[in-house]
Amino acid sequence: MELKKVWAVYFSGTGTTRSTVERIAHVIAGKLDLPVERVDFSVPTVRQREQRFNAADLVVFGTQVIAGRVPNVLLPYLREKIIGGGALVVPVVLFGNRNYDDALVELRNILAADGLHPVAAGAFVGEHSFSRVLGQGRPNEADKALMDEFAAKIARQVRALPAAPEKPVPVRGEDPIRPYYTPRDSAGNPINILKVKPRTEMTRCDGCGLFAEICDMGSINPAD
C-alpha cells in the first residue's frame, strides 16, 4: 500500500490520551517517512464537523475509557461524523488502571463501520482523570517503551501490506458490547458518580474563562 499521511486523532480530557496517540503516530510516521496531521476532538465544537480520511491515510485514533466503554457522549460524533474512506486505522484506548472491558472492541467496531480498516489496536494505562492515586505516574517510561515498540511493529506491518485487510484485527472484549460498568463502594453497593460536581474556589478564580473553553463536555457556563 502507498500511504501518504499519518493522523493522530483523539479525545483527551486530561492530555494523557493525546500524548499517547501522538507518540504512537509520530513513531509510525518516522519509520515510514510520512507527515503527521493532528485532530483533537476533545471539545464539542470540533465534534460538530465531519472528519474525512482516504485510502492513503493511516489513522491512530484514541479515546479514554469511561466505565469500561467508549464515552457515550462521543457516540454520535464517532458514528455520524467520521468518514473512513478506506483508511487504515489503529484504535487506541487509555484506561485508569481498573479495566478497559469492551472499550477497545467497541471503538474498533465503530471505526470499521465508518469505513476504516483496523490493522492493529492497543490499550494503555493512564493516570485516572478523577485521581492522582489511581494509575499514578502512568504512562511511565516502561509504558512509553511499549508504545514505541507497538508503533514500530505497526510500521513494519503496514509497509508489507499489499492492500487493506478485509477483516478487522482481533481484540479483547465481548461483542455484543456489555453495559457500562457500575462503580461500587467497598461494600459492593452501586455508586452514582453523576452526583460528583466540580467546585470552584472563587478566591483563586480570575475569570479568564479557560476551563469553560476547554471543557470536553461543554458544561461550564463562564457567566456562572
Predicted segments, located by residue:
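FMN-binding flavodoxin-like domain, especially the glycine-rich phosphate-binding loop
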Residues: 1-20, 24-43, 49-190
